[in-house]
């Protein structure tokens, strides 16, 4: 089953709607001053909710750090498929999205808000950050900035790779043909950039991605739309 991440959440209601309909990852924006930046108290409420969901289902990974401990035995060619399977079966998990913030700031946010995953969305030195972040990391790439990278480069110590349009979070549709070629040459990835309830099924079948990430595509008037969240997850999976 495809992995679904609903991102840019700013309310417990929207996060619960996502989780109750099958999203394995829910994301909050931790970058200060953005349109979708989450309030600290809301981030903590969502963190508590996803942890309680994992406890109630007897999740294998109550602490996401346990996932990293099993990577040593996973062959590179199965890396991302393995992680998707484990996340889907053991989630939901909370992802904190950061952009060019310090490692210290990220570490503090993990502790304060109980983040399960970190997503790096800027020009960070990924290898350096990953070595110093205790939870699994998702790294984001644009579809026109991956030349020269191999599947092995992308897999090492990353939980997942996110392939996005140039202007992430603004609804700009990614070039699906380039996304398909990326997957053929460099392995599996999550697809973001312009996916909506109406096109997500086609996007998945056309690109071969192993999961999808959406924010603006499930909004109405700049707010998360519960019906769109529900329909998106249904169509994606």
Swiss-Prot record:
Enzyme nomenclature, EC number: 5.3.1.24
Q: Which domain of life is it from?
A: Eukaryota
GO MF annotation list: phosphoribosylanthranilate isomerase activity
| Catalytic activity line of the entry | N-(5-phospho-beta-D-ribosyl)anthranilate = 1-(2-carboxyphenylamino)-1-deoxy-D-ribulose 5-phosphate
Isomerase in keyword set = yes
GO terms of biological process kind: L-tryptophan biosynthetic process
Q: In which pathway does it act?
A: Amino-acid biosynthesis; L-tryptophan biosynthesis; L-tryptophan from chorismate: step 3/5
Q: Which UniProt keywords apply?
A: Amino-acid biosynthesis, Aromatic amino acid biosynthesis, Isomerase, Tryptophan biosynthesis
Residue stretches in coiled coil: none
Task: State the family it belongs to.
Answer: Belongs to the TrpF family.
Q: What's this protein's name? A: N-(5'-phosphoribosyl)anthranilate isomerase
Species per Swiss-Prot/TrEMBL record: Komagataella pastoris (Yeast)
The primary gene name is TRP1
